[in-house]
């Protein structure tokens, strides 16, 4: 049975939650063994897949979880706004570390390596390709290039202002166009994740609301301060 077919079964049984275990850089939680522990806890709680950034984190996580891992490498480049898995060597390193799915930036922006080249390299390793997109045009273009999974990950992050709410309209548009959509980006409540599924998402990735303790504490502190002012 193919990995996609296996995921279809898991999603039907468990609801389609993917947990992104990406601590804030230099956080006390930003250690491979802690990332792996969070991933294992997420798997035991019913997550159908895990999203991991960085080769060391992926290696540590691969050793303890059996669910599929979506791997990425983030870089801050001087000559490109693209941050997610921008180079062939990133794809190769993630494949060697044990990723099942490799996600790349799928936006139409200046980049060191074309999207189609990165997709071909992912498929060369026999892995599934996911593209993190920001618009319907991004997603449809990446689908035509052969990406098996389209993420709404970058919606709101390629514009001057980032909205507070997730982009359900993008999920719906891409789903209705025949894309296998992972809704991602600002899904901070169970209700928002459920809305994404109702809008046609194949699965939903949740990160900050589950694995970034600093963000969760900030949300509570902000709300509680407002209540007493």
Swiss-Prot record:
Gene Ontology cellular component list: cytosol
Enzyme Commission number: 5.1.3.9
Catalytic activity: an N-acyl-D-glucosamine 6-phosphate = an N-acyl-D-mannosamine 6-phosphate
Keyword annotations: Carbohydrate metabolism, Isomerase
Superkingdom to which the source organism belongs: Bacteria
Pfam families linked: NanE
GO molecular function ontology, one term from the record: N-acylglucosamine-6-phosphate 2-epimerase activity
GO BP terms in the entry: carbohydrate metabolic process; N-acetylmannosamine catabolic process; N-acetylneuraminate catabolic process
Stretches that traverse the bilayer: none
Pathway in which the depicted protein is active: Amino-sugar metabolism; N-acetylneuraminate degradation; D-fructose 6-phosphate from N-acetylneuraminate: step 3/5
UniProt-listed NCBIfam families: PRK01130.1
Record-stated family: Belongs to the NanE family.
PANTHER family named among the record's database cross-references: N-ACETYLMANNOSAMINE-6-PHOSPHATE 2-EPIMERASE-RELATED (PTHR36204:SF1)
Function noted in UniProt: Converts N-acetylmannosamine-6-phosphate (ManNAc-6-P) to N-acetylglucosamine-6-phosphate (GlcNAc-6-P).
HAMAP family xref list: ManNAc6P_epimer
Name of the molecule in the record: Putative N-acetylmannosamine-6-phosphate 2-epimerase
Organism field: Shigella sonnei (strain Ss046)
